[in-house]
Amino acid sequence: MIRTGFTGMRERADMQIAAMTFRLHAPWVHSLKEKRMIVRSLTAQLRNRFHVSAAEIDEQDTHQIIVIGTAAIVPHSAMADSLMEEISAFVEGSTEAEVLEETMEIR
């Protein structure tokens, strides 16, 4: 993408997409209603704290497994790495659920 600033000079606008997936296990959850409360709380915290898109992306009908995906657009890969490390630490520290799997991708 090429954009033109006030000076009329053309510069290239680079961006990176940082995407993450978390697979969590919450053994104390016995209903979809309980699970929904956890998912809503965690996704809202991720959105508010890190300004990312966050949603439950899989296993919606399974009580004890939570799969949450996040995505953000950042100006460069160093910022993407930093953001993903912060999100990872936050997810691990903000819920009693065990993190079974975590994936990170920068495009």
How should these model regions be labeled?
Residues 17, 55-76:
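Short, charge-patterned binding micro-sites
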Residues 35:
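C-terminal binding/interaction regions
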Residues 16-27, 32:
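Short glycine-/aliphatic-rich beta-strand segments at the starts of folded cytosolic domains
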Residues 1-14:
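N-terminal amphipathic/basic-hydrophobic helices that include classical n-h-c signal peptides
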Residues 18-22, 68, 100-102:
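Hydrophobic residues positioned within well-ordered beta-strands of beta-sheet architectures
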Residues 52-57, 100-102:
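A short linear hydrophobic-aromatic micro-motif
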Residues 72-107:
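C-terminal structural segments of small proteins and small subunits
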